[in-house]
Amino acid sequence: YAREKGVKIKLVAQVVKVSDRKFTMFVMPEFVTPGKYIYSVDDEYNGVVIRGECYDRQFMFGKGAGSLPTASSILSDIMARQHDYRYEYKKQHYLDRPEYTTDVELKVYVRYTETDVLKILHFDRITEQYRGEDGNYVIGYIRLSELLAKREVLRGKDVFMADFQSFFQELDR
């Protein structure tokens, strides 16, 4: 499907401010079009797109730390936690803590072989559906809360799922 549409599949982490008091976050494969910054990020390289109140969007790109530096960093964090070390973040005392929400709608692509998958997932609406000998897929809108509630059931199924329309679409043009 991705090759046919001229897109790449990338594993993308997203943290999105939904409202003044709420945010959502998730990690999911995403279909990435050639016009997006992250399209050209391959192999051991990482990329991040951020947007702040005092600046427009920024894209940062670079080589990942690799397995040894990453393992060292994780070990350091574990040791710090065992010794009750806490990183200081002074602004937390002055700002209201935002609330995490999964009550957001995602547009997703779901490829499946077992037909009961559509009975398990409750889409708000389906925009495209295909059934064939090689497999089936559906593109539609579904709540993140629904995906999280059904994740254990889906793990036992032959299912591939990808974010079809990034939350950050407007950031990445």
Identify the residue ranges that each predicted region occupies.
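Generic alpha-helix signal with a bias toward terminal, lower-confidence helices
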Residues: 19-21, 37-39, 62, 72, ...
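Active-site lining segments that contact anionic ligands and/or coordinate catalytic metals
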Residues: 22-24, 45-47, 55, 105-109, ...
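A conserved regulatory-domain signal marking ACT and ACT-like small-molecule sensing domains
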Residues: 78-173
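A broadly conserved detector of short glycine/acidic/proline-rich loop/turn motifs that flank catalytic sites
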Residues: 13-15, 31-33, 54, 64, ...
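Functionally constrained cores in energy, signaling, and assembly domains
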Residues: 10, 14, 30, 58, ...
